[in-house]
Every structure is written in structure tokens, then in C-alpha cells.
Amino acid sequence: WFRDVPGMNVSLPIPITLQRQSNSNRYVFNDTVDPTFKNLGGFFPINGQLYGNYSNTGKNFHFTYVIDTEFVYEAGQGHVFTFTGDDDVWVFVDGKLVIDLGGVHSAVSQTIELDRCNWLQSGKTYSLKFFFAERHTTKSNFRIETTLNLRNVAPPGATALSD
């Protein structure tokens, strides 16, 4: 699902920006207020693109989305990562599953408190990998809230048109 397979799927980069909330250390992306998505009626980043839309709804409900980022863990700072949305979501920190919202469902939330991850060492850099699959054909909700200072990670290099 989450990688290009020639003849099976295609991809394109879709950036999102987490906005720092006033007078806080929280960063939020919310499809209901984001200028790119608020008028689309949900998180629909590829309407009319790639393999097209579902039926005649004008919405492309069937897609996956990946975020590959990193952060420096600071022990005792109360850092959290919260996702609210529908359908499948898996979040891994340092290769360990920390959020599992698998399955087709209405919008639900799950939070990971990083201080509860006893394998993390303060001052070290860790990966955060986020996997989202939109499979249902009614809504697409997508909200991230975090206190982590997430960094961009360069995408892997390609040696050919498809690896």
C-alpha cells in the first residue's frame, strides 16, 4: 500500500503544514481549517488526480498517505502526538508501533505520551513514521496535534523511474 508498485499504484508528494498554536508549544494540522482542504469537505488530497475519483462523487476516497519525520526526544517535557481521523492509521516511533487505529471506522483519536516510551533517551534523535489509509466512501477526517518539533526528512533517492 505505501510504496510505488509499477502498474498497481502511483504517488505524488502532498505537503501539509502543522501550524503552531498561539501561546503554546502545540502544532496542529486540521483538514477542517487548513486553507488547502477546508473547502473540500474533508482530507481529500488527490481529488481528480492519479487513478481518479470514486463513482461520480467528485471525491477520491481511496488513497494512502505517509509522513516520514524525526524529532529530538526531551525527557520530562510532556511531549505528545495525537491523531484524530477515520480509517486506518499506524504511527511508529523508532520502529515501534505506538498508535494503532486500524480498520474502517468513523473519526476517533489516539494519543501517545512520549514519556511513557521507556526506550527513548533524552537528547537523541528518533524517527516518527505515520501511515494513513483512506478506504471508506463517506468521509475523510485528518487532524494531527503534537508538541514535538518534527523535522523534515529527505525522501530516499531513486536509481530508476521505479525501484
Residue ranges: model-predicted function:
Residues 1-163:
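Acidic/polar, compositionally biased interaction segments
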